[in-house]
Structures are given as structure tokens and as C-alpha cells.
């Protein structure tokens, strides 16, 4: 019998000027970017938390503390690679990931395939094992007021042992 684990993740960051907007490792043209200690890639952060949560390994703040200068401006895809290594070392592999990005603007549909390609390359899975959807918050809440962008992710891990 195959063992599986499921984890979920969430992240939100504030939109500010003079920062790049990076989602799923893709630089998205926009006048605002996300504020954070690293590159503030909320999608990748939510996926990392989902992977860690599936194995009861805590959250990304435990491994990459926001007050630690070594993570300042860090490329979240490199952090994801480290989390993926933890998953593999424990005898698990990614079955699939499903995620949602909540942003009023910019329109993200043109960038979803590139995000899927970047994430699947890091996680060593086929692109069709990574689901990414984008939606608005219908002008409600911080995302709807364009104060921030958030992402939700669910990860299914399959035992390779």
C-alpha cells in the first residue's frame, strides 16, 4: 500500500513600490512588488509550507528565519530546492501540488505556464503535477484593495519507501 501525506500552506505579503513582483519564480511586470526579507514570492512560500506541513516539519520561518541576514533577498526557488531535499531525504516525493494566487492586479493568467515550468523543474516533477490558479478577491480585503497578494497551496506527498 502506498503511503501519502497532505499538507497545506499560505502566505501573504504587502505590495509596495520599488520591489519586483516575483511569483512562482517568475518576474511579473507590474508597478508594485512584494515586500519581504527574501524575494517575497508568496506562491513559492505557500508551496514550501505545504511540503513542510505534510511531513510535520514546521514552517519556512523555522528553516529560513526572516531576521537572519543570510536570507535577505534570497531567491525563493533556491529555498524551495532545499525544502525539496528535506522531503526526498525522508523518503517522499511530490505527488502533486495545487495552488491559488489571490491578486486584484496584474492579470496572472499569461504567466501561469511559466510559473508551473519553473516550479516543476525545481521539484523534479512533470508540469501537470503542479496546478496554479489565479483569482481576484472581488475588491474585498487587502488583496482586493491591492494592498497585498496571497497564495494558498496543498501538497500531496507519496512515499518512495
From Swiss-Prot:
Its EC number is 4.6.1.12. A divalent metal cation binds at residues 11, 13, 45. Its cofactor is a divalent metal cation. Keywords: Isoprene biosynthesis, Lyase, Metal-binding. GO terms for biological process: isopentenyl diphosphate biosynthetic process, methylerythritol 4-phosphate pathway; terpenoid biosynthetic process. Homotrimer. The keyword Methyltransferase does not apply. It catalyses: 4-CDP-2-C-methyl-D-erythritol 2-phosphate = 2-C-methyl-D-erythritol 2,4-cyclic diphosphate + CMP. Belongs to the IspF family. It comes from the Bacteria. One of its GO terms (molecular function) is metal ion binding. PROSITE patterns: ISPF. Binds 1 divalent metal cation per subunit. CDD domains: MECDP_synthase (cd00554). It is an enzyme of class 4 (lyase). InterPro entries: MECDP_synthase, MECDP_synthase_CS, MECDP_synthase_sf. This is 2-C-methyl-D-erythritol 2,4-cyclodiphosphate synthase. The record marks 37, 136 as: Transition state stabilizer. Involved in the biosynthesis of isopentenyl diphosphate (IPP) and dimethylallyl diphosphate (DMAPP), two major building blocks of isoprenoid compounds. Catalyzes the conversion of 4-diphosphocytidyl-2-C-methyl-D-erythritol 2-phosphate (CDP-ME2P) to 2-C-methyl-D-erythritol 2,4-cyclodiphosphate (ME-CPP) with a corresponding release of cytidine 5-monophosphate (CMP). Pfam families: YgbB. 4-CDP-2-C-methyl-D-erythritol 2-phosphate binds at residues 11-13, 37-38, 59-61, 135-138, 145. Pathway: Isoprenoid biosynthesis; isopentenyl diphosphate biosynthesis via DXP pathway; isopentenyl diphosphate from 1-deoxy-D-xylulose 5-phosphate: step 4/6.
Amino acid at each position: 500500500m502506498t503511503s501519502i501525506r497532505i499538507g497545506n500552506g499560505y502566505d501573504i505579503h504587502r505590495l509596495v513600490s520599488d520591489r519586483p513582483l516575483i511569483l512562482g519564480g517568475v518576474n511579473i511586470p507590474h508597478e508594485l512588488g512584494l515586500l519581504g526579507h527574501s524575494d517575497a514570492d508568496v506562491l513559492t512560500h505557500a508551496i514550501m509550507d505545504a511540503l513542510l506541513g505534510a511531513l510535520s516539519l514546521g514552517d519556512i520561518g523555522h528553516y529560513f528565519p526572516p531576521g537572519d541576514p543570510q536570507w535577505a533577498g534570497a531567491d525563493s526557488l533556491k529555498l524551495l530546492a532545499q525544502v525539496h531535499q528535506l522531503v526526498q531525504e525522508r523518503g517522499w516525493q511530490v505527488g502533486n501540488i495545487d495552488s491559488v494566487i489571490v491578486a486584484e492586479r496584474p492579470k496572472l493568467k499569461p504567466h501561469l505556464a511559466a510559473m508551473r515550468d519553473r516550479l516543476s523543474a525545481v521539484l523534479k516533477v512533470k508540469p501537470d503535477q503542479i496546478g496554479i490558479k489565479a483569482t481576484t478577491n472581488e475588491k474585498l480585503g487587502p488583496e482586493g484593495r491591492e494592498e497585498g497578494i496571497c497564495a494558498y497551496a496543498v501538497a500531496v506527498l507519496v512515499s518512495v519507501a
